[in-house]
From Swiss-Prot:
Residues 412-471 have a biased composition (Acidic residues). Coiled coil: none annotated. GO terms for cellular component: chromosome; nucleus. Residues 472-492 have a biased composition (Basic and acidic residues). The gene is RTT106. Interacts with histones H3 and H4. Pfam families: PH_18 (PF18469), Rttp106-like_middle (PF08512). It is found in: Nucleus; Chromosome. Belongs to the RTT106 family. The keyword Chaperone applies. Residues 396-408 have a biased composition (Polar residues). This is Histone chaperone RTT106. SMART domains: Rtt106. Signal peptide: none annotated.
Length: 492
């Protein structure tokens, strides 16, 4: 009997030997089976490396060779570190899936892996490894419209972006992880799994939180638990949700169209996060401004429609305010993309009530007035440049964001760059028509279902909006004088 049989347990060796002794030709069958299994495992490892956009033998990318990783087609319960079951993903897939941290073996040690898992067969659809180095930004954010409603404040967004260097395969989607969390539904699941005590609601006086937009102590402890579990797996999860027990995060502005929030340990009057409704071309979304913290540099983001944008503030060269009307304005930033090429990005139909929040952020990072450089002089009428600039500054500086709840009201901006494919876009396939699994909880059904229906209605209107915006763009340019512009750029 050859050495190949030695890889099996003793009992199985005896059974194989008994079969081979009765029929010598069966030995080749066993050898063929072993060769087939080894080939399949090798293909799986290559597929994992390709799916992650990594070189198969890249020690720099993952700390050691991916040849030594042997992921299972299903996740064994004993390997699960932490799991949020059946949550609504918006990206990179669009269905209810499990968000699972689990272990796979590498060099005899457990390696943490973040997987998007199909609950129907417990099989990972997408997996991310080397989390400590791969994750660029991981956030929990309020949802505009939910943050003002005490009944919906617990439905929030978790999003996670990977570093561009993590993807070496240009065919691999760079879409971030974006999913909705229903904290009240998760509370029930955590009680059922004994991660929270069954009498947790009796341990706190929740009376004052029922009509409040601040997280109640139970919701805050769920977020704290998530933060600690993510940290255990090498991911720094930062929460921008209002809370007043474990951490002190406070709303400075909380409207249906914008929020601004200060975080624990920082100046309570200075926002650590600003999020406002805007458009990029014909697509609506959120402009998000993040101050530097202990884990991340300052960022400017556009989310949550595809393609999302993520830029460190150090990559922003200048900012211009244009298309100023009574109610709205546009912000155009010049950035350096990953190829160190300058790129212009316009965010339009921003409620002018939030101009000061945005301008304060721009100014605080050394992006100051540069209206009169040679490039921008062409955009203004020379004889009226000073008058226009002063008038725009005066008009936009008179409204305080805390006293307005008006929605953005204006025409669409220039959509020329909306269809461009750019290396710095977190872009991928925009096939969002996959089926959504059944609701797993009645609480999630009543709250999350409402949000999903609204989102589907928005998507059905998107083609009409794009066509309307294309027609309105010409009107907008005729409507606004060329003099209505001023620009900000980096201080020398």
């Amino acid at each position: 009997m050859t050495d190949w049989i030695g890889q099996f347990p003793k009992e199985l060796q005896d059974r194989i030997q008994a079969v081979v002794s009765r029929d010598a030709s069966s030995q080749q069958v066993f050898i063929d089976v072993i060769n087939f299994i080894e080939k399949e495992e090798s293909n799986k490892r290559r597929k994992l490396a390709s799916g992650l956009g990594l070189a198969e033998d890249s020690n720099d990318a993952v700390g050691s060779s991916l040849d030594e990783l042997s992921p299972s087609p299903t996740i064994h319960p004993d390997t699960i570190i932490f799991e949020i079951p059946q949550v609504s993903f918006m990206s990179p897939v669009r269905k209810r899936m499990n968000l699972t941290f689990h272990l796979i073996e590498q060099n005899g040690q457990g390696l943490p892996v973040l997987s998007i898992v199909n609950p129907a067969n417990n099989s990972p659809d997408i997996s991310y490894i080397n989390l400590q180095n791969a994750v660029k930004l991981c956030l929990i954010l309020p949802i505009l419209g939910n943050s003002t409603n005490p009944l919906k404040k617990g439905v929030v967004t978790l999003c996670c972006w990977m570093h561009d260097l993590y993807y070496t395969d240009v065919n691999v989607s760079k879409d971030p992880l974006i999913l909705q969390l229903n904290l009240d539904a998760i509370k029930k699941l955590m009680i059922k799994s004994e991660k929270l005590p069954a009498d947790i609601e009796n341990q706190f006086d929740l009376t004052n939180y029922r009509n409040s937009v601040i997280l109640n102590p139970i919701q805050e402890r769920i977020i704290d638990y998530f933060t600690r579990q993510f940290k255990l797996c090498g991911v720094n999860l930062v929460s921008y949700l209002p809370s007043d027990t474990i951490v002190k995060n406070s709303f400075i502005v909380n409207q249906d169209t914008a929020v601004a929030l200060s975080t624990s340990g920082n100046d309570s009057t200075k926002p650590a996060m600003v999020m406002v409704e805007c458009h990029k071309g014909a697509r609506d979304g959120n402009l998000i401004l993040l101050e530097q913290n202990e884990h991340n540099p300052a960022y400017i983001l556009f989310a949550f429609r595809k393609p999302t944008l993520v830029y460190a503030i150090s990559r922003v060269l200048s900012a211009s305010y244009t298309s100023v009307t009574k109610h709205t304005f546009s912000l155009t930033i010049i950035v350096l993309n990953e190829k160190d090429e300058e790129r212009s990005i316009e965010f339009s139909i921003i409620d002018q009530a939030y101009f000061q929040l945005i301008d304060d952020f721009i100014r605080s990072h050394g992006i100051s007035d540069d209206s009169f450089n040679e490039d921008n002089k062409e955009k203004v009428v020379d004889s009226k440049a000073n008058v226009v600039r002063a008038a725009v500054n005066g008009m936009l500086g008179t409204t305080t964001p805390a006293t307005t709840n008006s929605r953005a009201n204006g025409d669409g901006g220039d959509d020329d760059d909306d269809e461009e494919e750019d290396g710095d876009f977190e872009a991928g396939n925009d096939d969002d028509d996959s089926d959504v699994a059944e609701e797993y909880d009645s609480a999630a059904e009543s709250v999350e279902g409402e949000g999903e229906e609204e989102e589907e209605e928005e998507e059905e209107k998107e083609e009409d909006v794009e066509e309307e915006d294309e027609n309105n763009t010409g009107k907008e340019r005729t409507k606004h004088r060329n003099g209505d512009v001023f620009t900000r750029s980096k201080e020398e």
